[in-house]
Amino acid sequence: MALSDLNPVERNEEGIAAVLGILKQRLGERFQTGEAIRSQHAHTTTYIPTQAPDGVAFPETTAEVQEIVRACAAHRVPVVAFGVGSSLEGHTNAPGGGISVDTSRMNRILAVNPQDLDCTVEPGVTREDLNRHLRDTGLFFPIDPGANASLGGMAATRASGTNAVRYGTMRENVLSLTAVMADGETVTTGKRAKKSSAGYDLTRLLIGSEGTLGIITSLTLRLQGIPQAISGGVCPFPGVEAACNAVIATIQMGIPVARIELVNALQMRAMKNYSKLDYPESPCLFVEFHGSDAGVAEQAETFGMIAEENGGGPFLWTSVAEERTKLWKARHDAYWSSLTLRPGAKGLSTDVCVPISRFAECVMETEADIAEMGLIAPIVGHAGDGNFHVLVLMDVNDPKEIAQSEKFVARLNMRAIAMDGTCTGEHGIGQGKIGFLRHELGHGVDIMRTIKQALDPLNIMNPGKILPGN
């Protein structure tokens, strides 16, 4: 990541002026151009500079999204989809200006099919909204990124979360979707069948496309039954390597762990102070098991023995819902707790993912880099699938700190790629990781560019993201 890697996008002043007039007339108060609301719809969660759109539209239907996109296509004006703005790599920035399409009013749950374990929702529904709605059905949607993100945004970035080791990512949990493409036409990528061999997999093409190919306007999602019993707890370890070895042993023994999260010592200190946890300031694993009463108790006991064999413990676990909720709220608040380690600093949040056999090595080398460079950068990770996050705290007004932080992130990304991993497990490419995509995928980037040019020949759909250059 480097600010110098950000793709410049030329502004089309004449086209923008025309579209502003068209959308104001069509949407009335649901089209806003005030400075405050435009700034809110640019990227603000990390150090990438804010690049505001020229207007913000609040459509309520797929047909209105089509109208917006057609107007923008006619005048060659950029269109940037916006959910709740929780993405971390500059996805919602508008480097060439244009229109931000805020999907928050498209927040209906269109259908729930309990017997089929699926539901269909609009993109503005958040994961917490959906799970509140599902509570009385005995079902839940398991994907849980740290933020209460919109489901449309989660699909667009191919998000995952703490449950991915058991339930997968958005890639595995979206059955089909409807999207408005760059010409204003809609495409529905599939039916509700649990599997299909019918042609190209357009669902997977659009999942993770970050709004660069189309704007998602509905999704059909897989659901899971709420487990009969849940147990979970925290286990301290003398070091990161011991914790990672316990993770590998747990996975290899076939224990159906639902969550297994690594928190390094610095992150644990931040979480203790911010979330009032009473655990040691040492590397810890946050673990959870789903199943029957007998099953989760047996799994917890077995994990405790594995932890002890690797120098960890004691594993303190509970089946009390309130205690587990406090634990996982602290985990989901890790970003905010990290910021307290250096008040006033901005966070450069990054993530990588490596094969689980290289996870300990990657984390330990990263910690060595942090120490060598004198950075304040806590680590937290989805240890069960080899994915971890680093939040580098820095003074964004100090060019030397920015350069040092960017150097660190570059070394981390290249290390992950060299280990046969990826420069991003779940944040996406956006603006921040464009410079690493070719290192990871080589000629695959050229094929992506061909797809982009075929589906969006005017380059109006979230330009300046994913692909190097324009």
Short names for language-model regions:
Residues E29, I417-I429, G442, P457-M461:
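Alpha-helix capping/hinge segments and adjacent helical runs
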Residues E185, I434-N470:
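Activity-critical C-terminal alpha-helical subdomain
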Residues M1-R70, S86-L117, A265-S275, A321-S349, ...:
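N-terminal flexible segment immediately upstream of the FAD-binding catalytic core
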Residues R108-E261, M461:
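FAD-binding subdomain of flavoenzyme oxidoreductases
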Residues T33-H41, G225, S231, P236-F408, ...:
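C-terminal substrate-recognition/cap domain of FAD-linked oxidoreductases
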